[in-house]
Amino acid sequence: MGEHEYPEDVRTFAFRNWALRLGLDVKGLVYADGPFTVENGRLQGRQLVQDHADDLPDAVIVAADPLAVGVLQAFATENVMVPRDIKVISINNQEIAKYTSPALSSYDISQDELAKAAVLMLAEALTANRKISQHMRISTSLVARDSFTPQD
């Protein structure tokens, strides 16, 4: 709620920040341009394969299921086998995730919790005329399917 100024998309910023904290080298491995569409996912997936054909990352985390559908399509076109050659995890757990090939592992974001938090924040902003920005955390859970299965 409210305006924020970040040097890049907040998810990309958070990903880079956590990678740095965990000592992961992600230089040249973050593809974060364009809309969250299947077509853009195909473009980003194709670009990743072209850029890293000789040394693919172990896995990719895709910001939204429609993008991930395109990434899976690009990998199939480029003969990159998921999950053998690269694992794919997405975010939102939309209905389409269970119908892709392979079925897409995706983080489910509690829509009920998100809606409740949004309504409470809106009510607070309206009654208190609050203009201070606020961040919140919403519960997620991984719905593991064929594109990525956590190891025990």
Predicted regions and their residues:
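Bacterial carbohydrate/catabolite-sensing allosteric modules
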Residues: 1-152
